[in-house]
Amino acid sequence: MFLNHTITALSSGMASLVAPIPLLATVEAENSPIVMSGVLLSLVVIYIASKIGAEVALKFDFPPVLGELVAGVIIGISALHLIVFPGSGLSASDSGIMTVLQSINHLSPAALTSVFESQSEVISVLAELGVIILLFEIGLESDLKQLKQVGIQATVVACVGVAVPFAAGTAGLMIIFHTAAIPAIFAGAALTATSIGITSKVLSDLGQLNSKEGQIIVGAAVIDDVLGIIVLAVVASLAKTGEIDVVNVIYLIVSATIFLLGSILLGGIFDKTFSAVVIQLKTRGNIIIPAFIFAYFMAFLGNAIHLEAILGAFAAGLVLDESDARNDLDEMVKPIADLFVPIFFVTVGARADLGVLNPTVPDNRAGLLIAVFLIVVAILGKIVTGWVVFGQPGINRLAIGVGMIPRGEVGLVFAGIGSASGVLDKPLEVSIIIMVILTTFLAPPFLRIAFGDTVVPPATGELSSEKIV
């Protein structure tokens, strides 16, 4: 109601200046309740799909996030067309949500298109907010003390696990498939991430979380996440300019690194301030509101210095992870993430047009080859990391390499941002999503095979305090 009154008041105030504007504003004011209806109905569909998908995935012992992604594919452009977006090749009349609104409100074609675009924009903004909250949550779950203890072995594994897939993926796409530089770099960057959550769960199930291999894998995965976020911030910024300038690339890498490290170093000072503020506040939200003020401000700073909001959100999570209120904050963020993060994952799936990889269409075969190439590089590029471990005779190198394979949610962040920015064409976008799905599905059985007869009864899940060097 407030929005309606505001739009109407603005249109009345401008009437004496420009005649057509009040009419346009009046039309928009009339459509705003319908836009809200479209947003609400879209959220109903997204939440139902995400919950069903997550529950089915969990039933088969797969990460819920993959269920949310597949649910998005089903309700999106690839199947049911319930949630579609402008630029996908479908119009407002193809959207199931818009069909319902049309039948209720009898909209003209022009009004239907206007509502469709406005509703899609709102859902896209909510999805972007979801990924910011996701990276904030990942930052909160990343233990800086563990980062300091992982030692040189995990650091080397992480660096190689980022460099090899990135270089091989980017070079292969440009040389073999003649992909343009920036899309190739973006796809190569999507190969760098490792999902610590998936790997940790499998290691815990196998009783290998406290083993030397387990400590190296988990430590490397944590560092891998940090490096991956820096890479994402850099390549996403490159996508905005549309060109590769060496000076700009150096600036982005240096500024992203300084921003992240600077935030961590200043974290000790801010932790005390944050704790003092929390103690002084007596009303509801005394912990979560200051935390999100900090997270959103850091996200704003990330954007302001021409990086990415997600880098700022991730840095905020790392900083607050050291605060006295960490445990309370972890629990408070979860329900907020539960509301917004599924919107991101479902919309990533909804935007993915799997039809571009239909093998019966000759023009799609190049896209299929790209998907196969990315999957091979994604697997081999991580497996080689096991052979860079030194000074550890008898260590299971294959298990270390396989443990770095799953991409999980961070890989989907690459796909989502690449799609939203327009830097990825449909075949490349879908190839990245399929790569993420397959590597995440394949990693658990591969890891069980790699450990073979060395499996021991599940441990408590706590990491040993012994430093691997």
Task: Give, region by region, the residue ranges found by the protein language model.
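Transmembrane helical cores of multi-pass secondary ion antiporters/exchangers
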Residues: 2-469
